[in-house]
Design a protein with these regions (language model features):
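Generic beta-strand/beta-sheet core signal
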Residues: 154, 189-190
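Non-heme Fe(II)-dependent double-stranded beta-helix
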Residues: 1-12, 18-126
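Catalytic core of non-heme Fe(II) oxygenases with the double-stranded beta-helix
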Residues: 106-180
Length: 196
Protein backbone atom coordinates (compact mmCIF):
# COMPACT_ATOMS: atom_id res chain seq x y z
CA UNK A 1 0.00 0.00 0.00
CA UNK A 2 1.48 3.33 -1.03
CA UNK A 3 1.73 6.38 1.22
CA UNK A 4 -0.80 8.17 -1.01
CA UNK A 5 -3.25 5.27 -0.68
CA UNK A 6 -2.83 5.29 3.12
CA UNK A 7 -3.50 9.02 3.26
CA UNK A 8 -6.60 8.82 1.04
CA UNK A 9 -8.04 5.80 2.86
CA UNK A 10 -7.57 7.45 6.25
CA UNK A 11 -8.98 10.76 4.99
CA UNK A 12 -11.98 9.41 3.07
CA UNK A 13 -12.60 5.92 4.44
CA UNK A 14 -12.23 4.42 0.95
CA UNK A 15 -10.07 4.35 -2.16
CA UNK A 16 -10.74 3.38 -5.76
CA UNK A 17 -8.16 1.20 -7.49
CA UNK A 18 -8.38 1.59 -11.26
CA UNK A 19 -8.20 -1.28 -13.77
CA UNK A 20 -7.28 -4.13 -11.40
CA UNK A 21 -9.65 -6.69 -12.98
CA UNK A 22 -8.96 -7.54 -16.65
CA UNK A 23 -11.85 -7.28 -19.10
CA UNK A 24 -11.79 -11.06 -19.67
CA UNK A 25 -12.51 -11.65 -15.96
CA UNK A 26 -15.25 -8.97 -15.94
CA UNK A 27 -16.87 -10.62 -18.98
CA UNK A 28 -16.71 -14.08 -17.38
CA UNK A 29 -18.30 -12.80 -14.14
CA UNK A 30 -21.05 -10.98 -16.05
CA UNK A 31 -21.78 -14.06 -18.14
CA UNK A 32 -22.21 -16.09 -14.96
CA UNK A 33 -24.39 -13.44 -13.32
CA UNK A 34 -26.67 -13.25 -16.36
CA UNK A 35 -27.90 -16.76 -15.52
CA UNK A 36 -29.29 -15.68 -12.15
CA UNK A 37 -31.01 -12.42 -13.09
CA UNK A 38 -34.32 -14.01 -14.10
CA UNK A 39 -33.87 -17.34 -12.32
CA UNK A 40 -36.38 -18.03 -9.53
CA UNK A 41 -34.47 -17.97 -6.21
CA UNK A 42 -35.63 -21.50 -5.39
CA UNK A 43 -33.68 -22.67 -8.47
CA UNK A 44 -30.39 -21.10 -7.34
CA UNK A 45 -27.67 -23.71 -6.89
CA UNK A 46 -26.74 -24.26 -3.26
CA UNK A 47 -25.39 -22.38 -1.28
CA UNK A 48 -26.65 -19.32 -3.21
CA UNK A 49 -29.59 -17.60 -1.55
CA UNK A 50 -31.27 -14.23 -1.42
CA UNK A 51 -29.70 -11.80 1.05
CA UNK A 52 -32.88 -9.70 1.03
CA UNK A 53 -36.26 -10.29 -0.62
CA UNK A 54 -36.16 -9.83 -4.41
CA UNK A 55 -37.95 -6.73 -5.71
CA UNK A 56 -38.49 -5.13 -9.11
CA UNK A 57 -35.62 -2.76 -8.23
CA UNK A 58 -33.05 -5.11 -6.71
CA UNK A 59 -31.73 -8.65 -6.36
CA UNK A 60 -29.21 -9.38 -3.57
CA UNK A 61 -27.64 -12.84 -3.85
CA UNK A 62 -25.42 -14.16 -1.06
CA UNK A 63 -22.52 -16.64 -1.47
CA UNK A 64 -21.93 -15.65 -5.11
CA UNK A 65 -18.35 -16.91 -5.00
CA UNK A 66 -19.67 -20.48 -5.01
CA UNK A 67 -21.73 -19.84 -8.16
CA UNK A 68 -18.91 -20.12 -10.66
CA UNK A 69 -15.12 -20.43 -10.84
CA UNK A 70 -15.14 -17.14 -12.79
CA UNK A 71 -15.38 -15.29 -9.47
CA UNK A 72 -12.20 -16.89 -8.09
CA UNK A 73 -10.14 -14.22 -9.86
CA UNK A 74 -11.56 -11.62 -7.48
CA UNK A 75 -10.13 -13.34 -4.39
CA UNK A 76 -6.43 -12.60 -4.65
CA UNK A 77 -5.74 -9.56 -6.80
CA UNK A 78 -2.32 -8.30 -5.63
CA UNK A 79 -3.23 -4.59 -5.75
CA UNK A 80 -6.38 -5.22 -3.70
CA UNK A 81 -4.65 -7.46 -1.17
CA UNK A 82 -1.90 -4.87 -0.71
CA UNK A 83 -4.51 -2.32 0.39
CA UNK A 84 -6.49 -4.81 2.48
CA UNK A 85 -3.32 -5.89 4.26
CA UNK A 86 -2.36 -2.25 4.80
CA UNK A 87 -5.68 -1.24 6.35
CA UNK A 88 -6.12 -4.37 8.47
CA UNK A 89 -2.54 -4.32 9.77
CA UNK A 90 -1.86 -7.61 8.00
CA UNK A 91 -4.59 -9.76 9.51
CA UNK A 92 -7.52 -10.49 7.19
CA UNK A 93 -9.87 -13.20 5.93
CA UNK A 94 -12.60 -13.54 3.33
CA UNK A 95 -15.81 -13.25 5.34
CA UNK A 96 -18.64 -13.30 2.81
CA UNK A 97 -19.46 -12.68 -0.84
CA UNK A 98 -22.54 -11.35 -2.54
CA UNK A 99 -23.77 -9.56 -5.64
CA UNK A 100 -26.39 -6.87 -5.97
CA UNK A 101 -28.28 -6.20 -9.17
CA UNK A 102 -29.94 -2.80 -9.01
CA UNK A 103 -32.22 -1.07 -11.52
CA UNK A 104 -33.74 2.43 -11.83
CA UNK A 105 -35.17 3.63 -8.53
CA UNK A 106 -33.32 1.05 -6.45
CA UNK A 107 -31.09 2.12 -3.59
CA UNK A 108 -29.98 0.97 -0.17
CA UNK A 109 -30.42 3.16 2.84
CA UNK A 110 -27.32 4.50 4.52
CA UNK A 111 -25.59 1.93 6.68
CA UNK A 112 -22.31 1.68 8.51
CA UNK A 113 -20.74 3.85 11.21
CA UNK A 114 -20.00 3.22 14.85
CA UNK A 115 -22.59 5.01 16.99
CA UNK A 116 -23.48 3.33 19.21
CA UNK A 117 -20.11 1.56 19.37
CA UNK A 118 -19.90 -1.61 17.31
CA UNK A 119 -17.13 -3.82 18.65
CA UNK A 120 -16.97 -5.96 15.51
CA UNK A 121 -16.26 -2.95 13.31
CA UNK A 122 -13.60 -0.48 14.41
CA UNK A 123 -11.20 1.94 12.76
CA UNK A 124 -8.19 3.56 14.36
CA UNK A 125 -4.62 4.66 13.62
CA UNK A 126 -1.60 4.43 15.89
CA UNK A 127 2.13 4.81 15.25
CA UNK A 128 1.67 5.14 11.49
CA UNK A 129 -0.51 2.04 11.14
CA UNK A 130 -4.23 1.81 10.61
CA UNK A 131 -6.61 -0.94 11.64
CA UNK A 132 -9.97 -1.34 9.96
CA UNK A 133 -11.46 -4.49 11.46
CA UNK A 134 -14.24 -4.78 8.86
CA UNK A 135 -13.16 -3.81 5.35
CA UNK A 136 -14.89 -4.53 2.04
CA UNK A 137 -13.80 -4.65 -1.58
CA UNK A 138 -16.47 -3.94 -4.20
CA UNK A 139 -15.90 -4.83 -7.84
CA UNK A 140 -18.20 -2.99 -10.28
CA UNK A 141 -18.85 -5.27 -13.24
CA UNK A 142 -20.18 -2.43 -15.37
CA UNK A 143 -19.27 1.24 -15.62
CA UNK A 144 -21.09 3.09 -12.83
CA UNK A 145 -21.01 6.87 -13.12
CA UNK A 146 -22.91 9.44 -11.07
CA UNK A 147 -26.04 9.30 -13.24
CA UNK A 148 -25.95 5.48 -13.20
CA UNK A 149 -26.50 5.22 -9.45
CA UNK A 150 -22.89 4.43 -8.58
CA UNK A 151 -21.56 3.43 -5.18
CA UNK A 152 -21.75 6.37 -2.77
CA UNK A 153 -21.01 7.37 0.79
CA UNK A 154 -20.21 10.14 3.23
CA UNK A 155 -16.43 10.63 2.94
CA UNK A 156 -14.72 10.76 6.32
CA UNK A 157 -17.78 9.54 8.23
CA UNK A 158 -15.79 6.56 9.54
CA UNK A 159 -14.11 8.98 11.95
CA UNK A 160 -17.17 10.98 13.01
CA UNK A 161 -17.91 10.97 16.73
CA UNK A 162 -21.48 12.16 16.47
CA UNK A 163 -24.78 10.76 15.25
CA UNK A 164 -25.66 11.72 11.66
CA UNK A 165 -28.32 14.48 11.88
CA UNK A 166 -30.11 13.43 8.68
CA UNK A 167 -32.30 10.47 7.76
CA UNK A 168 -31.38 7.15 6.18
CA UNK A 169 -32.25 7.96 2.54
CA UNK A 170 -29.29 9.19 0.47
CA UNK A 171 -31.31 12.21 -0.75
CA UNK A 172 -31.70 13.40 2.86
CA UNK A 173 -27.93 13.74 3.35
CA UNK A 174 -26.33 16.89 1.90
CA UNK A 175 -22.79 15.55 2.43
CA UNK A 176 -23.50 12.26 0.64
CA UNK A 177 -21.15 11.89 -2.36
CA UNK A 178 -21.07 9.60 -5.40
CA UNK A 179 -18.02 7.36 -5.83
CA UNK A 180 -17.99 6.51 -9.55
CA UNK A 181 -16.01 3.51 -10.79
CA UNK A 182 -15.72 1.47 -13.96
CA UNK A 183 -15.85 -2.22 -14.72
CA UNK A 184 -12.44 -3.54 -13.72
CA UNK A 185 -11.99 -1.13 -10.81
CA UNK A 186 -12.13 -1.99 -7.11
CA UNK A 187 -13.55 0.17 -4.33
CA UNK A 188 -12.07 -0.69 -0.93
CA UNK A 189 -13.70 0.83 2.13
CA UNK A 190 -14.05 0.50 5.87
CA UNK A 191 -17.52 -0.61 6.93
CA UNK A 192 -17.59 2.28 9.39
CA UNK A 193 -18.06 4.57 6.40
CA UNK A 194 -21.70 5.51 5.80
CA UNK A 195 -22.44 4.01 2.38
CA UNK A 196 -25.40 3.26 0.17
Amino acid sequence: MTEEQKYLFDLQGYIVLKDVVPSSAVEACNKSLDRFEDMPPEDFPSPLCLGTPKTEKEIYISNILEADAAFNFLIDIPEVLSVVQGVTCGSYRLNHTYTIYRWAGGYSGLHGHNIPISYKCQYHCRNGEMVSTLTKAVFPLMDCDVEDGCFAGIPGSHKSNFIRPWGGHPDENPVFAPIPANAGDAIIFTCLLYTS
